[in-house]
């Protein structure tokens, strides 16, 4: 009779095996993507490899609360806490999107103690490209 295949690393039993070893990262890039529905904060090293990330959804906010400034502030704090422990001192900030969480996330990043070399808005703007969707009638 065939032996049952053991389940390794399912969602229920959490992380099996060890995490990647924490590297010392003195400088990095913080990407903030703020949409109307959610805010995603990703911290990468200078080469673009993801070190840490967080979003309003992973912080426990659900539904319309994910788009709030407080949710963005919490997500930014969560993402940055881990990289500060890994020794990040300087960072560049790239902010994308029109959401409410833009300023709140930036305020949380400033409060974390990381020295910001610059803050850049990288929201994609069309040079009159695709036709936008029709306006909502509520």
Swiss-Prot record:
GO terms for molecular function: rRNA binding; structural constituent of ribosome. GO terms for cellular component: chloroplast; ribonucleoprotein complex; ribosome. Keywords: Chloroplast, Plastid, Ribonucleoprotein, Ribosomal protein, RNA-binding, rRNA-binding. InterPro entries: Ribosomal_uS11, Ribosomal_uS11_bac-type, Ribosomal_uS11_CS, Ribosomal_uS11_sf. Its main location: plastid. The keyword RNA-binding applies. The keyword Mitochondrion does not apply. It holds the Pfam family Ribosomal_S11. It is found in: Plastid, Chloroplast. It comes from the Eukaryota. Residues 9-23 have a biased composition (Basic residues). PROSITE patterns: RIBOSOMAL_S11. Gene3D superfamilies: Ribosomal protein S11 (3.30.420.80). Residues 1-23 are annotated as: Disordered. GO terms for biological process: translation. Part of the 30S ribosomal subunit. Belongs to the universal ribosomal protein uS11 family. PANTHER family: 40S RIBOSOMAL PROTEIN S14/30S RIBOSOMAL PROTEIN S11. This is Small ribosomal subunit protein uS11c. The gene is rps11.
């Amino acid at each position: 009779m065939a032996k049952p295949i053991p389940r390794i690393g399912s969602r229920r039993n959490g992380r099996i095996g060890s995490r990647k070893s924490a590297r010392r990262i003195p400088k990095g890039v913080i990407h903030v993507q703020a949409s109307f529905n959610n805010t995603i904060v990703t911290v990468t090293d200078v080469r673009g490899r993801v070190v840490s990330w967080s979003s309003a959804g992973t912080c426990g906010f659900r539904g319309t609360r994910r788009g709030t400034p407080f949710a963005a502030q919490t997500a930014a704090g969560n993402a940055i806490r881990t990289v500060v422990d890994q020794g990040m001192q300087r960072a560049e900030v790239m902010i994308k999107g029109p959401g409410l969480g833009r300023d709140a996330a930036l305020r949380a990043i400033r409060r974390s103690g990381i020295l910001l070399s610059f803050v850049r808005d990288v929201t994609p703007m069309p040079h009159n490209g695709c036709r936008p969707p029709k306006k909502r009638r509520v």
